[in-house]
C-alpha cells in the first residue's frame, strides 16, 4: 500500500510541477513587464472582443496537429522498443514531436512573429529549417515509411505544397480570385493537416498492432 501511494504521489508531483511553474512564470511576467494577467489567461476572443469563431480553421488545425502528436507519442510509449520494433518506435516518437512542434508554431505564430524577433532571422529561414527537419526525417526513416500507408503521407504533402504555392504568389492569385485566395491557402493547409493526422493515426495503429505480435 505504501509503495502504491508513493508511486501515486510521484505521478501527481510530475503531473503538476510544470503547470504550477507555468502559472508562476506568467505571474512573474505580468509583474515584471506590467502586462495585465488577463492577457495570459483569458481567451483571445474575449481580450480582442472579436467573434468566438474567428480563426476557426486555424484553431481546428492546431487541435488536429496536437491530436496527431499525442497519438504518436502514446503509441511510442506503449510500444516497448525491442530489436525488431526500435526503429518504428523512434519513428513514432519523431513524428509525434514534429507534429507538436508544428501545432505550437501554428498556435503562437512562432515562425511568423516569435522566432524572427528572438533569433533575428527571416520567416523564410525558419520555414527552411522546418523543411530540412522533415527531409532529414524522411531520409533517416525512409525504409520505415515504406512499411506504412505512405500514400496518405504523400497526399498530405501535396496539400501542404499547394498551400505554399498559393502563399508564394499572393498578388497573382488574388488578381484572379480576389479574397478567396485566403480560402485556398488556408484550406489547402487544413487539408494537409487532416492528411497528416490520418497518416499519424494509421502509423500509431500499426505500432500498437506490433505489441500483439511481441
Regions picked out by a protein language model, each given a short descriptive name:
Residues 70-74, 129-148, 200:
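Alpha-helical transmembrane segments in multipass membrane proteins, preferentially the mid-helix core
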Residues 77-89, 140-152:
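Membrane-interface helix-boundary motifs at transmembrane edges
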Residues 29-34, 107-115, 165-176:
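Juxtamembrane "helix-exit" motif on the non-cytosolic side of transmembrane helices
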Residues 91-99, 147-171:
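Alpha-helical transmembrane segments of multi-pass integral membrane proteins
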Residues 16-39, 167:
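Alpha-helical transmembrane segments of multi-pass membrane proteins
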Residues 93, 100-139:
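Membrane-proximal helix-loop-helix units in multi-pass membrane proteins
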Amino acid at each position: 500500500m505504501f509503495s502504491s501511494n508513493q508511486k501515486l504521489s510521484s505521478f501527481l508531483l510530475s503531473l503538476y510541477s510544470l503547470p504550477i511553474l507555468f502559472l508562476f512564470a506568467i505571474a512573474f511576467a505580468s509583474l515584471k513587464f506590467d502586462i495585465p494577467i488577463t492577457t495570459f489567461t483569458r481567451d483571445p476572443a474575449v481580450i480582442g472582443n472579436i467573434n468566438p469563431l474567428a480563426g476557426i480553421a486555424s484553431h481546428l488545425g492546431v487541435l488536429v496537429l496536437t491530436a496527431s502528436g499525442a497519438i504518436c507519442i502514446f503509441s511510442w510509449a506503449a510500444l516497448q522498443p525491442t530489436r525488431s520494433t526500435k526503429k518504428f518506435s523512434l519513428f513514432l516518437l519523431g513524428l509525434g514531436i514534429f507534429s507538436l512542434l508544428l501545432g505550437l508554431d501554428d498556435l503562437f505564430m512562432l515562425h511568423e512573429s516569435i522566432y524572427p524577433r528572438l533569433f533575428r532571422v527571416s520567416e523564410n529561414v525558419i520555414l527552411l529549417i522546418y523543411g530540412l527537419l522533415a527531409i532529414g526525417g524522411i531520409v533517416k526513416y525512409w525504409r520505415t515509411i515504406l512499411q506504412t500507408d505512405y500514400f496518405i503521407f504523400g497526399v498530405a504533402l501535396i496539400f501542404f505544397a499547394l498551400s505554399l504555392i498559393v502563399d508564394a504568389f499572393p498578388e497573382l492569385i488574388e488578381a484572379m480570385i480576389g479574397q478567396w485566395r485566403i480560402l485556398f491557402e488556408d484550406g489547402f493547409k487544413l487539408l494537409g493537416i487532416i492528411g497528416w493526422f490520418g497518416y499519424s493515426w494509421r502509423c500509431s495503429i500499426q505500432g500498437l498492432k506490433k505489441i500483439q505480435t511481441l
